[in-house]
């Protein structure tokens, strides 16, 4: 049986520095974080962007892990080259194959701490259920968005993204660092419990399923001509109902939520998403029954069956 190995990534975006700082301190003091004896690799996702103090150099690294893009190194694209390196080093067929990838991020939006799952892979949903049961974190299921693909964790058999905010880009914050450490240790603890078959899965999983993203108001030339309404700013995870305020213009015009069905907004006014023409994303809160297939998939993965 292969040794269980977990890839821990911080700095997938070079200006999200709290996880990077935590990893650097961890290297100095190996006892700082309890991995419960599980072999881990702590990796800075985008070291070149970190040096430059930028989110990325040529292309968003967390959109660079697309199927078929690892065939050859592209010297003209730092992030696609780095994506290939990470898969070659730590992917299923890599030099140090990891079964699970955990990618630690921060956000400028008032998201608090949450877990992001891409698609509906059984092992992902099982691990997300465990961490939600332990810490009560919301789970954002990102799917059905063809404009946003190629996420890092999708290149591993099981993978979750941890998002913590709000925090400005390039800033250290004690709360963010403490939350990152807590979630990392809890994830490792739960993986350890699965490894030892000493685990308790919840009966339900609360999901915030991605519906769509919306852009800022724009004028005829494509320039942003409105901003997030004061009643919507910093109200991530709070239900939107028809006619609630979304945006405001300087002339006093208010743009309202027009959907008949209530949605839950997330990543409201995230600074890094402006270039992606995203002002916020809408989700639908759903209560899912925990499936035995999820549990078995995670157990089989960790025990290499």
From Swiss-Prot:
Annotated binding of substrate, by residue: 55, 62-63, 163, 273
Keyword Metal-binding: yes
Family matches, as InterPro entries: AspA/AstE_fam, Aspartoacylase, AstE_AspA_cat, Aste_AspA_hybrid_dom
Cofactor detail note: Binds 1 zinc ion per subunit.
Cofactor(s) annotated in UniProt: Zn(2+)
Gene3D superfamilies reported in the protein's UniProt record: 2.20.25.160, Zn peptidases
EC numbers, comma separated: 3.5.1.15
Protein name: Probable aspartoacylase
Lineage: Bacteria, Bacillati, Cyanobacteriota, Cyanophyceae, Synechococcales
